[in-house]
Amino acid sequence: MHPFRLPRRAAILGSGAALLAAPSLRAQGRFPDRPIRLLVPWAAGGTTDIQMRALAEAASRRLGQPVVVENRAGAGGVLAAQQLLNERPDGHVLAQLPISVFRHPQMAQRALFNPLEDFTYVIHVSGYLFGVVVRADAPWRTFAEFLDHAKANPGRLNYGTPGVGTSLHITMEQIAQMRGVEWVHVPFRGVAENMQALLGGQIEATADSSGWAELVQAGRLRLLVVWSAERAKRFPDVPTLRESGIDLVSASPYGLGGPKGMNPEHVRVLHDAFREAIFDPSHVAILDRFDMAPWHMPPAEYTAFARKQYAEEGEMIRRLGLRL
């Protein structure tokens, strides 16, 4: 028996056809083939905006296409997620998905999206350092004094956050319930507006991510408490909520997602590029600046985490009786 061989002419023609087809196939399968839009649901200049821009730049170098940040501030951080409902699932539009994405549909009278069905979870990125700050000339030097004042003056003390349904808002209301105090929530569109209102005297305190850090170090604000499990490295003298007698930890984990129905291969490419970007020294330096840390999860793990978060946040919302 002789092994089967193509006639020489047929072999040459077949090889030529394959060579001609190869570039076409490669071109058809190239991803991404244009800039990627990254929707950020917070105002420009805040902690998340700065960090997302560093992440986008690092990812751009790996994807071979620009990752362009577009700010969609307001509505407690859900406008970017809402925008995904109108986008094609071709992998060229992503959004930062903060924890409020799991809360708002369970607080609203009519949910505009279902976070368990309407998104593709690409990669989990990080979480925040949160804390409560007051002006440096405020009368409260500790969080205990702040709480005592609130309890003695129900409904008269106010605080600002980046929006309704954010981790800052939810945790402050948890604290109020646990300590039997009543205070007034003042929502803003982002950290910049929040800080301006505090410095200008329109509000008495701010609960926010560590965008306040430089103002604290400059002596313009006083940090009363942090919400992390351990004390912040940059502020070792400031106690945690647990050390202050309140058994809470809040870090507001978040990641990146796209519209539902994305091509799994596109998800893989995006995940791999952003995973490398998360640990890129230029991005890690920004995380360090805001006392944050890498918190990577791949798509399957992040999707399971999202389902768990949705259930836990719903239980808390019902317990606190929160509505939009």
Task: Identify the role of each PLM range.
Residues 156-238:
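Ligand-binding pocket segment of bilobal, Venus flytrap-like solute-binding proteins
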Residues 86-92, 106-193, 253-286:
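Hinge/capping helix and adjacent helix->loop/strand transition within the periplasmic-binding protein
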Residues 27-117, 156, 181-207, 215, ...:
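N-terminal (or domain-start) structured segment
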Residues 43-45, 99-100, 135-140, 161-166, ...:
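Short coil/turn segments
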Residues 33-35, 177-181, 264-324:
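An extracytoplasmic/periplasmic, membrane-proximal ligand-sensing/linker region
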Residues 21-24:
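N-terminal signal peptide c-region/cleavage motif recognized by signal peptidases
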Residues 1-17:
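N-terminal secretory signal peptides and thylakoid transit peptides that target proteins
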Residues 212-279, 308-311:
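C-terminal lobe and pocket-closing loops
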